[in-house]
Amino acid sequence: MRQVAFYGKGGIGKSTTQQNTAAALASMGYRLMVVGCDPKADCTRLLLRGVRQPSVLDTLRDVGPESVQLEKVVVQGYGGVKCVESGGPEPGVGCGGRGVITAIQTLETLGAYKDDLDYVFYDVLGDVVCGGFAMPIREGYAEEIYIVCSGEYMALFAANNICKGIKKFAERGYARLGGLVCNSRLVENEQALVKEFARRLNTKMIHFIPRSKDVQRAEINKKTVIDYDPDLPQAQEYRELARKIDENDEFTIPTPITQEELEDLMREYGIVD
């Protein structure tokens, strides 16, 4: 069983990319569980065709730890993907990252990881790897990490920050970086820029996902692209990303760059003057 964490700047399309990749792997015959590590509890929406499932934390609050059953918090979605949402604390009370810890520990207690799974995906909130949201890495669950980014400055800035956190954990023997996924925002020289950025981080751009309105069309219909229309070119892009992740055996300790180096890189590729 491979355990994979997806990180990335808020709004970059991380959850969309993760769910479409999960759907692609499921269509290839793999068995998956997706664990949404976001208090908004929207990391499995497309796999569940818009159905909002009860989160682990909401269920714990409603029935108490002793009465929680696995089938109450694990819902089957597209292609048999098992979907879980960690949820979060009540607004203004508690720590969202702590909620992730509680949710994953609950799943383990209930035996969710004993199922015959090929992959577990963790869809993790956060532009930085803070203590709670780093839990899938720190506790030895996630073994490989992919960062979703684009050629925009703030997306690369966030990716670099995430790499700083990963580096600390990787040096202690925890998860390694599997690569960057560029979710295109139609930035000038975007593909070349992200490739070079990845090289400087001691990793690779594992796939470049072109911008496509079909992603939005599928989302409006509450589906992944593969579920919406498996013959679309964009569906093939996600199948290709899934294949590359499945075949990937290059995992590294990242080498984050300075803010000045990032700004120089943006100038080099004509992104900023």
Swiss-Prot record:
Its cofactor is [4Fe-4S] cluster. InterPro entries: NifH/chlL_CS, NifH/frxC, Nitrogenase_Fe_NifH, P-loop_NTPase. Binds 1 [4Fe-4S] cluster per dimer. It is an enzyme of class 1 (oxidoreductase). One of its GO terms (molecular function) is metal ion binding. ATP binds at G8, K9, G10, G11, I12, G13, K14, S15. The reversible ADP-ribosylation of Arg-98 inactivates the nitrogenase reductase and regulates nitrogenase activity. PROSITE patterns: NIFH_FRXC_1 (PS00746), NIFH_FRXC_2 (PS00692), NIFH_FRXC_3 (PS51026). Its EC number is 1.18.6.1. Belongs to the NifH/BchL/ChlL family. NCBIfam families: nifH. This is Nitrogenase iron protein.
